[in-house]
Structures are given as C-alpha cells and as structure tokens.
A protein has these predicted regions:
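A glycine- and Lys/Arg-enriched "phosphate-lid" helix/loop adjacent to the NTP-binding pocket
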Residues: 25-26, 74-126
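P-loop NTPase switch/communication element
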Residues: 13-25
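Single conserved hydrophobic/aromatic residue that forms the stacking wall/gate
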Residues: 1-6, 10-11
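Glycine-rich phosphate-binding loop used to anchor ATP phosphates in small-molecule kinases
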Residues: 29-74
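NTP-dependent small-molecule kinase module
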Residues: 117, 121-163
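Structural signal for short hydrophobic segments within the conserved structured cores
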Residues: 26, 31, 83, 141-143
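Residue-level signature of catalytic and energy-coupling elements of molecular machines
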Residues: 6, 42, 56, 85, ...
Length: 163
C-alpha cells in the first residue's frame, strides 16, 4: 500500500502554494487546517498514487467532515476505509513527548506547552468524535500507545494483517 501521511506532510510538501502557505499558518498556531484545504491536498495525493493497491493514512482524517469527504473521494475509486487505528495515550504523556520532540526536531509547534495544549483541545473537540464515526462502522481498533516502539508497532501490524 501507499502511505499518505495526512494533512501535515501534504501541507509541508506544498508550502509554496497559496493553500500550503495558508495551511501552514494554521498548523504553526496548533490549529486544524480547514477541511476544504486538506481535502483538496489529499485528493491530489490520491490522484498522484492512483495505481496503489491501498492507502494508509496517518493523521488524516481529523474531523468527521473530512472522513465523509474522504469516503466520497474513495467511493469514486471504488475503495473504502478498512480500519481506523487509534493509539491511546494520556494527555500529560502527549505533552511530555511533544516537548521532547520539539527539542530534537526544532519544530516550533512542539516547543510550547500552550500550543501543544491547544492542539490537544482541538483534538478532543474535532478529532476524537472520529472514534464513534468509525466504531459505528465496526472499523475502530484502539491500541495502547504506551510501551516500546516494537510492541506498539507489532500491535498495529497485527490489526493491519487481520484486514
């Protein structure tokens, strides 16, 4: 399968376009990029990988509206989402991890606890409802996000291999 790493990579790859510049401003403030911007970028990624036998989306969709729009895009290709994998991690652990990542990566949006907390609030408000959206379709798989990278990776691979 082709791995599409969601809106963040899509935006960073197209930050020279008007949509990319606009989207990056939202990301730098820890906010979600508007759906119409993200959907357009993801649609372009799908088209440029149209011979793939499948897709793995990392960090996308982030809202139920995006999930519905993604379903519509995939319907045109006569494919559908097989599963949603959600990693369970407490907020305080996320803050700790992202601050550490900010030190090593230099990413400005990972160097401020206030921006990180804002991203977590945005997640709880806009992204967390995706669990119900995909659970209602029997596609939700929750995995414990605490543990070794190897263990977590094995758990994710087990879900993917079971599809």
């Amino acid at each position: 399968p082709c791995c599409l790493v969601g809106s963040e990579m899509c935006i960073r790859d197209s930050d020279k376009t008007q949509l990319g510049i606009e989207a990056k401003k939202y990301m730098d403030d820890g906010l979600l990029v508007p759906d119409e911007v993200v959907i357009g970028m993801i649609g372009s990624q799908l088209e440029s990988n149209n011979k793939s036998k499948g897709f793995i989306f990392d960090g996308f969709p982030r809202t139920t509206e995006q999930a519905t729009a993604l379903d519509n895009l995939l319907d045109k290709k006569e494919i559908s989402i097989s599963a949603m994998i959600s990693l369970k991690v407490e907020d305080n652990e996320l803050i700790k991890r992202l601050l550490e990542r900010g030190k090593s990566s230099g990413r400005s949006d990972d160097q401020s606890e206030e921006i990180i907390s804002n991203r977590i609030k945005e997640y709880n408000l806009k992204t967390s409802p995706l669990k119900s959206f995909y659970n209602n379709q029997n596609k939700l798989h929750e995995i414990e996000g605490i543990g070794s990278i190897s263990d977590i990776s094995n758990n994710i691979n087990s879900v993917i291999n079971s599809l």
